[in-house]
Amino acid sequence: MSSTQFNKGPSYGLSAEVKNRLLSKYDPQKEAELRSWIEGLTGLSIGPDFQKGLKDGVILCTLMNKLQPGSVPKINRSMQNWHQLENLSNFIKAMVSYGMNPVDLFEANDLFESGNMTQVQVSLLALAGKAKTKGLQSGVDIGVKYSEKQERNFDDATMKAGQCVIGLQMGTNKCASQSGMTAYGTRRHLYDPKNHILPPMDHCTISLQMGTNKCASQVGMTAPGTRRHIYDTKLGTDKCDNSSMSLQMGYTQGANQSGQVFGLGRQIYDPKYCPQGSAADGAPAGDGQGEAPEYLAYCQEEAGY
């Protein structure tokens, strides 16, 4: 089985766009630094093509044995594809045991099929940084040294004192003050004498936030509990029947409380203002002989008041 059977065909469309974007992030300068670092530690030559020189996994496994002896016990030097892929898998496992972060690792096909050489470059740079953090000295300054943990132990008194400190993320309270604030639980006044605002005369004063009552008046309003008349004779309302609704519902200029008795039930009409009609209206004008008993009893009750 030849290695060409593992190679992919040309990419088109979105796949080609993604591949080109990954290739654009590849740094040739970092490749030269990695080449010098790997060849300096292993003593092996990678060759002119960086990908083809590392795809068999022999140089990478040798590099891991230099960084951590015995991490790759067996290195396959066969030209078979599965042996080369096995070397790459052993190298990735050795990087995990060396302390590499999973996000910094690459897959075997990324290097073997040249699928994502940018990720391979990132992984090797992270490996160089991890080796520098562990104190490896090499002639090539490559990789970033990781910072070490700086743990601090505080006693209980210090931890409790820190709970009273306002963090800088919350702002500052240097200029904060409660000067002039009323004590908690006291009444809140609607005026301030320092601002030359007139104090309210009594508890019935309506503040400006509620509007104004300068034009409000209760002139002509009936007392609570009294009877409501359907019409008002002073306004010239026609006396059609006992179910007619007059303008009293929206107009009170001519209303008065003369002749009203408080505490009585509310009647639909008042016989003093709603007579039974005249002879001209088609009704017989009598002296009350033909009235209904209920109406006569009501008239006697009204006359008693």
Swiss-Prot record:
Residues carrying N6-acetyllysine: K8, K25
Pfam families named in the record: Calponin (PF00402), CH (PF00307)
UniProt note on tissues of expression: Smooth muscle, and tissues containing significant amounts of smooth muscle.
GO CC terms of this entry: stress fiber
Signal peptide: none
Listed GO biological process terms: actomyosin structure organization; cellular response to mechanical stimulus; establishment of localization in cell; hemopoiesis; macrophage migration; negative regulation of macrophage migration; negative regulation of phagocytosis; phagocytosis
Keywords: Acetylation, Actin-binding, Calmodulin-binding, Phosphoprotein, Repeat
Any one GO MF annotation of this record: calmodulin binding
InterPro entries, per database record: Calponin-like, Calponin/LIMCH1, Calponin_repeat, CH_dom, CH_dom_sf, SM22_calponin
Function text: Thin filament-associated protein that is implicated in the regulation and modulation of smooth muscle contraction. It is capable of binding to actin, calmodulin and tropomyosin. The interaction of calponin with actin inhibits the actomyosin Mg-ATPase activity.
Protein name stated in the entry: Calponin-2
Species this chain originates from: Mus musculus
Gene name of the record: Cnn2
